[in-house]
Regions:
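Bacterial N-terminal signal peptides
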Residues: 11-22
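Structural preference for beta-rich elements and adjacent junctions enriched in aromatics
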Residues: 34-38, 50-55, 92-350
Length: 350
C-alpha cells in the first residue's frame, strides 16, 4: 500500500496542546494525562486518566473527562484521593464512541479541588495491534488493515502500524526523512529503536538495577531491502550495561525478520519479532495489554523522534535508563522519555 505516504500518512497530525488555569505545570497541584486507548473506541473500552500529586501534601479532588463530541462517558466525574507524590489511574467507561479515520481523538481532562482547577487538553490515539501475519518483504500493502498511529517531529511525519499473531509481533514504521543512512562502522546512521514490556513493569532509576524490557534496534544494511535487528536488552540485562556502546555485531538478533525500503521520501521499516522469548511475560492473546514505545533516529534530519513525547508523558518522565545506547546513535541534550506506553492486542480494526 504505497499510498500510506500519499493519503492517510500525509495528513496533518493534531499536536498535543496544553491549557491550565494555573501558572504552569510545575506549579499545579496535580499532573494529568489521558492514556492511549488500547482497543477501538467503538467497542466500548475504558478510558484511563493518570493523575499525579505534585505537592508535598495529600490531594483530594474530582476528575472529569470530556470526550470527543457525540461520545458518552460514565461517570461524569470521579473522586481521587492521593498521598504526597502518589500517582493513580482513574477509569471512565466509554458507553458510546466512534472511530476516527485519522485515529486522533480530542479529549479534555479536568481536576478540581475547591477553587483550584487544572485542565489538560490532548489528542490521543488508539494504540492497538489487530490479528494478522504480514509478509516481511518491504512492501507495505498488507498494512492497510492495521491501526495507524501518527506523530510529527521537526516537521517530519512518522507512522506506526502493528499486527500480532500467536507466533510473532510485527511492526511497520513509516519515516518521512530527507535521506536514509544505512548501518556503518563509524558515524551516525538511521534506525528505529523499540521497547516492549509487560504491563506491570516499571523502569528503574538506578544503573545497578536490571532491565524489565525487550529492546530492539532496526537498521538498513545499505544493500537492497535488507535490514538487521539487534537485541539491545532483555529482562535481567544490567541497566549499567545498556549505557555502554556495545559492539552491535554481538547483539544481532537473527530470529527477527527485517526489510527496509524507501519510496517518495518515506522510509519503511518492516519487522517481525517472535513471541517465543517473550511469551512468559507477554502472552499473545486478544485483549492483552502491554507497553510499547519507539524512538526514530534521524541523525542528519530531525534527530530523535520520541513517541513518548507525543503520547503526552510528563517532562519529568524522561529517563536515560529506559533506552540503550548504541554506536551510531546521535542523542540529544535531554534524555528520551520513558518507554512505558500502553498498547493492546485486538482482533480487528473493523
Amino acid at each position: 500500500m504505497r499510498s500510506i505516504s500519499r493519503t492517510t500518512f500525509a495528513r496533518a497530525y493534531l499536536a498535543i496542546t496544553f491549557f491550565s488555569v494555573s501558572a504552569g505545570i510545575a506549579a499545579e497541584p496535580v499532573a494529568l494525562r489521558v492514556e492511549s486507548f488500547t482497543v477501538l473506541p467503538s467497542t466500548g473500552p475504558l478510558a484511563f486518566v493518570e493523575v499525579e500529586n505534585r505537592q508535598p501534601d495529600p490531594y483530594r479532588g474530582m476528575i472529569a473527562l470530556k470526550p470527543p463530541e457525540g461520545w458518552r462517558i460514565v461517570p461524569a466525574e470521579r473522586e481521587v484521593v492521593l498521598a504526597e507524590k502518589e500517582t493513580k489511574r482513574i477509569s471512565f467507561a466509554i458507553e458510546l464512541g466512534r472511530n476516527a479515520a485519522l485515529n486522533s481523538y480530542a479529549v479534555e481532562v479536568t481536576a478540581t479541588a475547591g477553587d483550584t482547577k487544572v485542565v489538560r487538553q490532548q489528542n490521543v490515539a488508539c494504540a492497538s495491534a489487530p490479528y494478522f501475519k504480514p509478509t516481511i518483504d518491504g512492501n507495505p500493502d498488507e498494512w492497510k488493515d492495521a491501526i495507524g498511529v501518527r506523530f510529527t517531529e521537526g516537521g517530519k511525519r512518522t507512522e506506526l502500524r502493528t499486527y500480532w499473531n500467536r507466533r510473532s509481533f510485527s511492526l511497520l514504521v513509516a519515516v518521512e526523512e530527507d535521506t536514509l543512512i544505512g548501518q556503518r562502522r563509524s558515524g551516525a546512521f538511521d534506525g528505529v529503536q523499540l521497547a516492549i514490556s509487560p504491563a506491570d513493569s516499571r523502569t528503574a532509576t538506578s544503573p545497578d538495577k536490571v532491565a524489565d524490557r525487550y529492546e530492539f534496534l532496526l537498521a538498513w544494511t545499505g544493500q537492497g531491502t535488507a535490514g538487521k535487528c539487534f537485541r539491545l536488552a532483555a529482562p535481567e540485562t544490567q541497566l549499567a550495561t545498556t549505557q555502554n556502546n556495545r559492539d552491535l555485531s554481538s547483539l544481532q538478533y537473527d530470529d527477527a525478520t527485517v526489510a527496509v525500503t524507501r519510496t517518495d521520501g518515506v522510509t519503511y521499516y518492516e519487522c517481525s519479532i517472535p513471541f517465543k522469548p517473550m511469551r512468559d511475560r507477554i502472552r499473545p492473546s486478544e485483549g492483552r495489554e502491554f507497553f510499547l514505545s519507539v524512538l526514530v533516529h534521524d541523525p542528519d534530519g530531525t534527530g530523535i523522534r520520541d513517541w513518548g513525547k507525543t503520547a503526552g508523558l510528563w517532562p519529568w518522565q524522561r529517563n536515560r535508563l529506559a533506552w540503550s545506547k548504541w554506536p551510531g546513535a546521535k542523542w540529544g541534550k535531554q534524555p528520551p522519555y520513558d518507554n512505558k506506553l500502553h498498547w493492546g492486542l485486538c482482533a480487528s480494526k473493523y
